């Protein structure tokens, strides 16, 4: 399919770098930061201080479906990594991605389960009671083999450990840029850590370290890459999170 060529296209310099992170860190995040101007980037700030505008995520395709709306076709899917599930969508105003996602949908509906890498832009949906649910709008994606997925796991584990180390260093420091840098926090993580520490307070980082170990265990071949994990069916007439995020994309609630 054309997916391989899609993800290898050069990224425009104006784009934010794609951060590597596991699903648990992203799904735990509930701190959005909207850009002050029309063209300023928006971010989701994770507990470890990652400022996520764009991310490179990976895992097993767990769910994929097509929906028809007045504005056109949309697609939503789940990618499962060792720590949890990323929700992503392809919007109606992205027709250039529709042929490739249709091909993946055809494979998925035949029972095929495959490994994917996806570059997506951070999105969030805010509920009436103040809850925040995160997702990605797909920009580029491709099906990958186990070796390429293993490289992603190792790189993502290293990136997560770097944020964990920076977070631990920040706990012994004043929350000022100069003090954090003096404590060994990398400059690119300072702003995010100040925002994260001010919003989330103290929390146990052990789950994130376990997630890193789970990822490395799969990379080393100790655990299976693809395991069956059927997605729960939605009950009643309440919209699913996938539907809510799709409606937000069409209607404008998000980053």
Region roles according to the model:
Residues 58-60, 78-80, 119-121:
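Residue-level recognition of well-ordered beta-strand positions that form the cores
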Residues 52-71:
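Structural detector for short beta-strands of small beta-barrel domains
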Residues 41, 94-105:
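Short acidic (Asp/Glu) patches
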Residues 100-121, 127-243, 252-255:
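Extended, charge-rich, solvent-exposed interface segments
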Residues 1-51, 211-220, 238, 242-246, ...:
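OB/S1-fold single-stranded nucleic-acid-binding modules
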Residues 64-69, 121-127:
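Short beta-strand micro-motifs enriched in acidic
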Residues 66-98, 136-147:
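OB-fold (S1/OB) nucleic-acid-binding surfaces
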């Amino acid at each position: 399919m054309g997916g391989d060529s899609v993800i290898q296209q050069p990224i425009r310099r104006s784009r934010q770098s794609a951060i590597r992170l596991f699903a648990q860190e992203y799904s735990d995040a509930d701190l959005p930061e909207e850009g002050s101007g029309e063209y300023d980037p928006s971010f989701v700030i994770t507990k470890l201080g990652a400022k996520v505008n764009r991310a490179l995520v990976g895992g097993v395709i767990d769910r994929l479906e097509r929906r028809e709306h007045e504005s056109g076709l949309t697609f939503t899917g789940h990618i499962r990594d060792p720590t949890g599930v990323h929700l992503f969508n392809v919007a109606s105003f992205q027709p250039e991605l529709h042929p490739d996602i249709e091909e993946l949908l055809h494979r998925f509906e035949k029972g095929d389960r495959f490994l994917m890498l996806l570059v997506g832009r951070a999105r969030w949906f805010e509920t009436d009671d103040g809850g925040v649910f995160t997702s990605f709008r797909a920009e580029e994606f491709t099906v990958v083999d186990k070796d390429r997925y293993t490289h992603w796991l190792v790189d993502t584990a290293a990136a997560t450990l770097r944020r964990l180390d920076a977070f631990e260093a920040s706990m012994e420091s004043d929350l000022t840029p100069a003090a954090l840098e003096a404590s060994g926090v990398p400059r690119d993580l300072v702003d995010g850590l100040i925002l994260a520490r001010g919003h989330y307070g103290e929390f146990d980082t052990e789950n994130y370290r376990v997630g890193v170990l789970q990822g490395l265990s799969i990379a080393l071949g100790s655990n299976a890459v693809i395991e069956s994990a059927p997605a729960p069916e939605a009950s009643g007439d309440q919209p699913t999170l996938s539907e809510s995020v799709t409606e937000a994309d069409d209607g404008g609630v998000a980053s």
